[in-house]
């Protein structure tokens, strides 16, 4: 086998490989003979079909298969000999060949050489926080509202009420698509409608008809409505006031607390909030570390890896549409390119961190991650058992653990300062960013 290596551009490499033509001819002849023994063709006894007949029927397909196998096998031998690390599958193109030699060209990208830089310049503001009794009380108040019952009242609508309304929206006197509804149930104070809409309903009583003027935000999802001033003609059909359940032992039973009453519920809420806080704090630090790592290190990215990641992200996005995905056009790659590039770059850089620090997934950490995740389920032991019995899921969890260890290794050399943060403000911000 003769091999020549050519750098075409960037990370792309081109191998020209020449092998004895006899390799292919012998393999083709052997395959034809084997097929002749197995073939069942009318007019011939089993195992007695002439090779010439098999060649006429299947020779072209057999030669293509053998040629592909020879190219793949010799390509692998060539990249090992030349110490090349391909990123993605190669493309094979047959080259100039004669009776003695078969030549082909393999084109592919290689992984970039990664040399970590500026790790000591990564700046991280590490947030610290605790779940207080006041935070637990706030959560209980939220749960009360979620379990509220509503009844019609004759007073003016106020924050926290539900209002059933008819509305017709118009811009410059013309109605617009999606701006009309009847008997629409509006939760006042929820912030789900555009600014000014909910507050415009407050203060009015059932039976009143009135207009509200609002401005659509510049970042509104409908392009034709961004920044536009709209008038909504409102008919208020009914105002409903909330009746909140009392916070007592009976309230605790609504959440499956059979023993311990209200105090047990508070303890469970505090535990869950603490777990969520810990996850959010770790995610925040990880994001800062990765952003710093990316800022300090510029590397060339294999286009094949980006394309592969785009496909993964595209499939994930389509899955979120469920049954509707079948009737949707394919989402354009541009939607995912930036995210794909980030994921590929992070993967390559963290891979080098893992290699440099000789990291291996700590089994104790892996089990801790599984236990933490399982604690959110009704039967944690069942979830732990399921994970431990599934090799693919265990490998995924080991990858998570290894990534955590890599981030911790980077933190050791980073410039870290601590900052105390309010639980509610921090979690609200984390939810918005997530």
From Swiss-Prot:
Residues 160-245 form the PPIase FKBP-type domain. The keyword Isomerase applies. Its main location: cytoplasm. It catalyses: [protein]-peptidylproline (omega=180) = [protein]-peptidylproline (omega=0). GO terms for biological process: 'de novo' cotranslational protein folding; cell division; chaperone-mediated protein folding; protein transport; protein unfolding. Its EC number is 5.2.1.8. Consists of 3 domains; the N-terminus binds the ribosome, the middle domain has PPIase activity, while the C-terminus has intrinsic chaperone activity on its own. This is Trigger factor. It comes from Shewanella woodyi (strain ATCC 51908 / MS32).
